[in-house]
A protein has these predicted regions:
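Accessory C-terminal segments flanking Radical SAM cores
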Residues: 223-337
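Short beta->alpha junction loops/turns
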Residues: 14, 63, 90-91, 114, ...
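Flexible loop residues that form catalytic
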Residues: 29, 62, 114, 181, ...
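Conserved phosphate-coordination/catalytic loops
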Residues: 36-40, 127-131, 292
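Structural motif corresponding to alpha-helix initiation and N-cap regions
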Residues: 39-43, 67, 94-95, 118, ...
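Conserved alpha-helical substructure of the radical SAM core
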Residues: 1-108
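Short Fe-S-cluster ligation motifs
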Residues: 45-61, 326-366
């Protein structure tokens, strides 16, 4: 393969978050504020990413606005020549602070919504946040910011997909990202309640196709399918260590946000080492880069340079082996584990099952 080029840095600057979403993708073991990298460390990391040829800086969390230095990090990204994107719940944002973010050089903001209906959105997030998010969306439209609205869909709301799209239209988003839940982190515990049926997925594809035609030139729509119903796996993160680097709040550098679950891998700390040494020399980044690690059927598959064997974390979670072909692949000998998960989910009564929240919102009296 050609030399890997760092294209995007995903800076997970904190795990602190005011939401308690039932499909939270953050790792099960999160870092406390005491372990977070300092402002100076993040600024050095951002500069080093630019020197490696990086184009994009994605500031995320948790909720990145939980940190008081977000503006400084945005400015550091802009001064380094990076396109700066903020991925946020909107909580913690005021009109004043939004202006400060814009003044610092923010290019793009991605605002998450859990639903278009307030009661359901608040139920999923475990907190009363929906009404405030609507105000934040209005403030964003007052600025010359690229605006992406993110909506997560699952078994309980995908039947209202047309309503969700109209909701995004009313908020005047430039782009709508409709993402089916990906079953990592906390979402795995709620999989039986969240996983849609095959009929729901097929219906959603027809709705997306019609909406894309209708909204051409007005609002772009990106649709992320649920892995479990795909014929072939997605090229997770564009391939392991091929173009993206994620750095968690404590500085651990990884090829993806879930990679820490893979046993035997030691991830270097960007707070202590240079990004170049990590990107070019880290054993963890080299482990699944290229094709040498692949087993059959991946090794001889004509799609090996398209999907790169799929997701290593999903292979571990479902097949018990991070080197195995992603079990969502129709060619995988472990596909039976996905079929069993689908059968179990479809058999569940979604109305009677209780959500397992990331943090108990009742106990916190949110």
């Amino acid at each position: 393969m050609s030399a890997a080029v760092l294209k995007a840095l995903i800076a997970e600057i904190t795990h602190r978050c005011p939401l308690h979403c039932v499909y939270c993708s953050n790792p099960l073991e999160m870092h406390s504020v005491e372990n977070e990298l300092s402002t100076a460390q993040w600024m050095r990391i951002i500069q080093e990413a630019a020197e490696l040829g990086c184009w994009h800086l994605h500031l995320t969390g948790g909720e990145p606005l939980s940190r008081k230095d977000t503006e400084q990090l945005i400015r550091a990204g802009r001064e380094a020549g990076l396109y700066v994107n903020l991925i946020t719940s909107g909580l913690g944002l005021t009109q004043e602070r939004l202006q400060q973010l814009v003044d610092a050089g923010l290019d793009h903001i991605q605002l998450s919504f859990q639903d278009s209906e307030e009661a359901e959105a608040n139920t999923v997030s475990g907190t009363r946040a929906h009404a405030y998010k609507l105000r934040v969306a209005e403030w964003i439209r007052e600025h010359r910011l690229a605006f992406t609205l993110n909506l997560v869909v699952h078994r309980r709301n995908v039947d209202r997909l047309e309503q969700l799209i109209r909701f995004a239209e009313r908020l005047k988003a430039d782009k709508l990202e409709i993402a089916n839940v990906q079953y990592y982190g906390w979402a795995f515990q709620n999989r039986a309640k969240l996983l849609p049926t095959l009929e729901q997925v097929r219906a959603s594809l027809r709705i997306i196709e019609d909406a894309r035609k209708r909204l051409t030139g007005t609002m772009r729509i990106e649709y992320v399918l649920p892995d479990y119903y795909a014929k072939y796996p997605k090229p997770c993160m564009g391939g392991w260590g091929r173009g993206l680097m994620l750095i968690d709040p404590a500085g651990r550098a990884m090829p993806c946000h879930a990679a820490a679950v893979i046993p035997g891998l030691e991830f270097p700390n960007a707070g202590e080492l240079s990004l170049r040494s990590i990107w070019e020399g880290s054993a963890a980044f080299q482990r699944f880069r290229g094709e040498a690690w692949m087993q059959e059927p991946c090794r001889s598959c004509e799609r090996r340079e398209i999907d790169f064997g799929g997701c290593r974390c999903q292979a571990l979670m479902l097949a018990g082996d991070a080197v195995a072909t992603d079990p969502v692949c129709s060619l995988s000998p472990s596909r039976k584990f996905v079929e069993e998960a689908i059968e179990m989910a479809v058999a569940h009564d979604t109305k009677s099952q209780v959500w397992v929240y990331r943090i108990d919102p009742v106990a916190l009296k949110t």
